[in-house]
Design a protein with these regions (language model features):
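N-terminal secretory signal peptides
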Residues: 1-31
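Conserved N-terminal alpha-helix of the aminotransferase class I/II PLP-enzyme fold
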Residues: 110-148, 398, 403
Length: 532
């Protein structure tokens, strides 16, 4: 046993605690090093702000390591946040780049002067953005938001009484409302998967829990990813492949995916997808993406697509060549009725719910009347910016920064405080910019079991922390009420009266290491800190 010359022998418990602290500090150094590699640091020792960075990129003195990070994200100059505001709630809504905002205003001014000047042009817009999401312009609709897209999906699929839909216990309100209407109006049976949290989580566990809900009556699955409560990115492709293997319709609420990660919808294999344009893609409000799989060709192809909105209905149009990836889902196309369109059945497209892979179904679904062209054009402009910057580079930036945040959290409150297992390098579940953690539960345990009274107290403390961060530190995050796994039995989730109230932080491309450190410093002033 180790000893100290003044204090005598050090207990095994203290030695273990010291080892855990050392391990946590190493995780922070590793996460920082991984992030700095994005800027080319680490090849040879450099000096930043008086701090020496070793050849492997690790800072020698963690206490002053913040000096090693760039003062701002390389993308930050494109955005116009209020001075001193640290906005970290992109999961609720994002912020459009300054140029996009300027062009948005200009478009509205032009429309005021010439009201019909921007009445059409959506086909060109869809041609522009579809490749960035790994799909055909014939399949991608610029919707009003994720909720709008989800409703147009579930109301267009001809569900019958007794059909079953598998969903999860952590859906956003849009998904909950959608399956509830199916239940109450059409007699659909809703079967719910309780999702695991913290060290109870694994992709295989998620797949097993979905499989346990499968019956002969199952018609569809509807799930969100990443989960807005926990930030966990579910195994989207594996779930869609499982659904296809069992001849089920797959519906994905991907509200947070556009703009956060590389999104290849053909590779994901979903039948339907709805995502937000105003969150991580940083478009204006009331914008989103609706995808409806309309083919099953497994090979990558070059397709010719028109530039006129009315080409599908016989109007002559110039065409452009667009590369699209092959489909991993080669199942027959499910029956689908367009529930919101001016031109149902035009040119035979989607008449009686019949599908034809050669049809431009997006043209029918897009024509719903006079939408906001400035909003649509602004959304396309943000997509152009993301494509130019590189969606892969953006995902790597976001994930690396989120991993650094998780390392700081694990260093202080322990890895048990996080919603998902903390592993480096980031596993698929962690390839997201959403981080959920709970510094309020007993032992800072995300899966701690709470009485209704303790749950209520935690909710008050969590809400107070969010409020104080905003009022005293100009930092915006949010909290949630989460049905977490139980520590005593991870196969069971907390009852509604005993939900926990963790904090949720969004790290995006305009944030930096300094921003994360600023958040951590503020958190230490307003939430519990371990007594080492």
């Amino acid at each position: 046993m180790r000893s100290h010359p003044k204090s005598g022998p050090i207990s095994e418990q203290v030695i273990k605690a010291i080892a855990e602290v050392d391990e946590a500090t190493e995780r922070v150094s590793t996460a920082r090093r991984d992030f700095l590699k994005l800027f080319g640091y680490g090849a040879a020792g450099v000096m930043l702000g008086g701090l020496s960075i070793d050849r492997d990129g690790a800072p020698r003195l963690f206490s002053t390591a913040a000096a090693a990070s760039p003062e701002k994200s390389p993308y930050a100059k494109e955005f116009g946040f209020s001075k001193d505001l640290l906005y970290m709630n992109i999961g609720t809504t994002g912020s459009s780049p300054t140029k996009v905002v300027t062009d948005f205003y200009a478009d509205y001014a032009d429309i005021a002067q010439s009201p019909t000047a921007y009445f059409f042009g959506q086909q060109v817009m869809r041609n522009t953005i579809a490749p960035g999401f790994g799909c055909d312009p014939y399949e991608l609709v610029m919707s009003f938001n994720t909720t709008d897209g989800l409703w147009r999906i579930v109301m267009g699929v001809p569900f019958q009484p007794g059909d079953e839909v598998i969903t999860t216990n952590m859906e956003e309100d849009a998904g909950i409302s959608a399956v509830s209407i199916l239940r109450d109006r059409f007699g659909v049976v809703v079967r719910t998967v309780d999702l695991p949290t913290n060290d109870a989580y694994s992709d295989q566990e998620v797949l097993d829990r979905f499989a346990a809900q499968l019956t002969a009556g199952t018609k569809a699955i509807l799930f969100s990813s990443p989960i807005y409560l926990t930030g966990a990115r579910l195994p989207e492709k594996a779930l869609c492949q499982w659904a296809a293997f069992n001849n089920l319709i797959s519906i994905v609420d991907g509200a947070h995916l556009p703009g956060m990660v590389v999104l290849d919808l053909h590779d994901m294999g979903c039948d339907f997808f709805s995502g937000a344009g105003h969150k991580w893609q940083c478009g204006p409000g009331q914008t989103g993406f609706l995808y409806i799989r309309n083919n099953f060709h497994p090979e990558d192809r070059i397709v010719e697509r028109p530039t006129s909105d009315f080409a599908p209905f016989g109007v002559p149009s110039e065409a452009v060549s667009i590369p699209i990836p092959g489909y991993t889902n080669t199942n027959p196309l499910p029956t689908y009725y367009p529930t919101n369109t001016l031109i149902y059945g035009a040119a035979g497209i989607l008449a009686n719910g019949v599908r034809n892979p050669e049809h431009n179904i997006a043209a029918v679904l897009q024509l719903v009347g006079n939408g906001s062209r400035p909003s649509q054009r602004a959304l396309v402009e943000t997509c152009d910016m993301w494509d130019a910057w590189g969606r892969g580079a953006i995902e790597d930036y976001i994930v690396s920064l989120a991993q650094y945040l998780r390392a700081r959290i694990a260093e202080i409150w322990g890895p048990q405080s996080l919603s998902i297992p903390y592993v480096t390098p980031a596993q698929p579940v962690a390839r997201t910019g959403l981080t959920s953690f709970n510094p309020f539960s007993p032992a800072f345990d995300y899966n701690a079991e709470l009485s209704p009274e303790a749950s209520s107290q935690q909710r008050s403390a969590s809400s107070a922390a969010v409020s104080t961060l905003m009022s005293d530190y100009s930092i915006v995050i949010r909290n949630n009420s989460v049905p977490h796994s139980l520590r005593s039995d991870p196969t069971q989730n907390a009852a509604p009266g005993s939900f926990s109230s963790p904090l949720r932080v969004s790290t995006h491309l305009f944030h930096s290491l300094d921003d994360v450190d600023r958040l951590i410093e503020a958190l230490l002033a307003v939430v519990p800190y371990p007594a080492w």
